[in-house]
Structures are given as C-alpha cells and as structure tokens.
C-alpha cells in the first residue's frame, strides 16, 4: 500500500491527508482548482516537504518527520507534469534514455512500442505535436524503472484532438503495465476512461475515497458536479451485438440489460458505462411498445430536492449498482415517488456513446 499521513501548510490551505492507496491500477485524484491535488503529488514525489507525518511506498519509508526524507531521485517514482518539459537539444531517443537506471534494450523497445514512438526516435521536440511531446515525457518517466508513476493533469495543456490522440496510449499503459499510477485530473471524462480508484480532495482534505464506481455514484460527488452533468457509473459485461442494427447488448450483474450505440468489440469483456442523470426517465409501471430501448427495474433509495426546488435527484438501486435520475418536482409529486418504491428507469440507447463506455482493468 501507499501509506500517507501528512500535514502541510500552503498559504491559506492546510493540506491534511491520512489514507492508504492500493499499489495497483490507476487512482484518480479529483477536486476543484486549489483543492490541493498538485500539492499532494509534489509531496509524494519529494518536490516539497511535509511539515509533519510520514509517507511509505510499500516497505520503503520515503518520509518521516525529522528522521527520513529521501530526495526525488532516490524515491523510484516517475513524474509526468502538465507540460512535457523535454530537453530541446536532445532527440526523442535522447530524451527517453535520459535518467534510465539500467540499459535495457527490451524495456526501451517495449515502452517505445506501447507509446507509438518508433518513427519519432530521431526527431527533436520542436517538430512534435503536444500529444507526441507528452508521450515522450511519459516514456522518459517509465524508463527510469519507477515503482510508482505520478501524473499531474498530463492532458490539461492539450486541445481536444490531442487529448483524444493521447488517451488511448494512457489506457494501454494502465492495462499493460503492472505499475501503480496516481493520476491528478479535474476531467471526469479522463477519470472514466483510466481510473480504477478515486480520491476526492476539498480544501486540502479527503471527502471521498474508494473504488471508482462507489465514489462516482456517491452523495459526496453531487456538490462537485453541475446538476446538468450528474451521472452514474454502471458495471456490465459485453454480451453480443444486435444482428440487424449497430447496437451492442450489455448485461448487468442483476440481470438487467443495456443496449448502447455502436458495435463494441471483445464479447464478455467487463466495462463501465456512464449514464447521464438527465437521460433517465421514470415510470411506476412497466412501459409497453416504447421507442426507448432500455427499461431497468429498480427501487428508489433516496430523494434529493435541488436547491431551487424545481428538480429532484433520485438514487435508484439496480442490484449492486446505483443509478441517478433528474426529474421535475411536479413529476415526483404526481407519481408519488418515495424511498423504497419500485419503479422502471428508462434510458435511450442513443444517449450512451463510445465516450461513455470504458473497459474495466
């Protein structure tokens, strides 16, 4: 485990974190600007020093107040910043090999192949796109043979096309490398595609932490997501494709099924599906002959009126999964919706696109 128990005063912000994070998969650190996300990873990487406490990476003590403070180069931690920070006078190959702990042609070839850098090895940073530069920066960090990788909003400085270019490479790294990654981001799109675990920071303190789906669907996330962007994550398995239409059938743990747009590959693969709360409607009786392809039987767990009393957020239990729905107060009153009532949630298949579906690692 990555064990963190530290305090640090940063101007008006007091960062106080006491937690353990798994040494596997991708842990997303989420929060608003100024929450302490970058400050936390700087403390983990040794770029700044806690005022008190300790940090351990597995059995290795990285920091203990007044006793141990390993410098960054001794921590075996790779760091990828928002900007690539490449050496302009070095070629791509020179940047990649800078800081390699051991000359390993096999490791070099694997990282170059995973990041798609084969044709760029003789190029210089000035000739690369923003996404290509970040791939080189990621490769350089990995070639130092780290025990953990810190990534501080690596897509933040890129435009949308470059983000879409780089994201598949990050997905591949997350799946192929047995290396824990701490990934700082304020983008839920990135977190959906990459993360296994999630930690939410607010004013220097942890307000939620755990498996991605648990945190994403939790009440603690509601204040940090605009009402129109509230969504749920559902775990499902790719079952099959429709024989006549470009749709794919997913099966949830409770037996409910979802039809989503497009033809997904890899039958039987586990996936996470994002469903926007504004795309969910509710019936108290099973609808017949509807154009809506997805009708899920569930039970209302909680009701949360919005601040303006115009809408109500319903939390619906679907077996082991939970689903958020935004409806009007009028509809809630007319249907006499209360906690414990069985309902049918309707979701249009066309509202769930490829960007709303991510493989489970």
Curated annotation (Swiss-Prot):
Principal place of residence: membrane
Gene3D superfamilies for the chain: 2.40.50.100, P-loop containing nucleotide triphosphate hydrolases
Enzyme class, UniProt record, top EC level: translocase
Domain Mop: 289-356
GO annotations of cellular component type: plasma membrane
Sample GO molecular function, one term: ATP binding
Protein name in the entry: Molybdenum import ATP-binding protein ModC
Lineage: Bacteria, Pseudomonadati, Pseudomonadota, Gammaproteobacteria, Alteromonadales
């Amino acid at each position: 485990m990555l064990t963190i128990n530290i305090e640090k005063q940063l101007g008006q912000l007091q960062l106080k974190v006491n937690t353990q994070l798994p040494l596997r998969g991708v842990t997303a650190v989420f929060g608003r600007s100024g929450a302490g996300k970058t400050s936390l990873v700087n403390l983990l990487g040794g770029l700044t020093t806690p005022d008190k406490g300790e940090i351990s990476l597995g059995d290795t003590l990285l920091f203990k107040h007044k006793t141990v403070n390993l410098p960054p180069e001794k921590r075996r931690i790779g760091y990828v910043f928002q900007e690539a920070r490449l050496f302009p006078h070095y070629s791509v190959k020179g940047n990649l090999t800078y800081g390699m702990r051991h000359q390993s042609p096999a490791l070099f070839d694997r990282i170059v192949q995973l990041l798609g850098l084969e044709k760029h090895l003789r190029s210089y940073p000035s000739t690369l796109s923003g996404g290509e530069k970040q791939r080189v920066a990621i490769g350089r960090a990995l070639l130092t043979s780290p025990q953990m990788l810190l990534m501080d909003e690596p897509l933040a400085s890129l435009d949308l096309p470059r983000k879409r270019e780089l994201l598949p490479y990050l997905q591949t790294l997350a799946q192929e490398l047995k290396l824990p990654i701490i990934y700082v981001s304020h983008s839920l799109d990135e977190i959906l595609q990459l993360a296994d675990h999630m930690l939410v920071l607010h004013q220097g303190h942890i307000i939620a932490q755990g498996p991605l789906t648990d945190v994403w669907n939790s009440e603690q996330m509601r204040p940090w997501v605009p009402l129109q962007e509230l969504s749920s994550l559902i775990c499902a398995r790719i079952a099959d494709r429709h024989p006549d239409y470009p749709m794919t059938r997913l099966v949830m743990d409770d037996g409910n099924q979802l039809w989503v747009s497009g033809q997904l590959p890899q039958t039987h693969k586990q996936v996470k599906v994002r469903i926007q709360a504004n795309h969910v409607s509710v019936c108290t009786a099973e609808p017949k002959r509807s154009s809506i392809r997805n009708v899920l039987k569930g039970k209302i767990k909680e009701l949360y009126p919005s601040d303006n009393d115009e809408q109500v957020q319903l939390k619906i239990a679907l077996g082991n999964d939970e689903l958020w729905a935004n409806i009007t107060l009028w509809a809630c009153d007319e249907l006499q919706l209360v906690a414990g009532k069985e309902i049918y949630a309707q979701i249009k298949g066309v509202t769930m696109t490829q960007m709303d579906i991510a493989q489970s690692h």
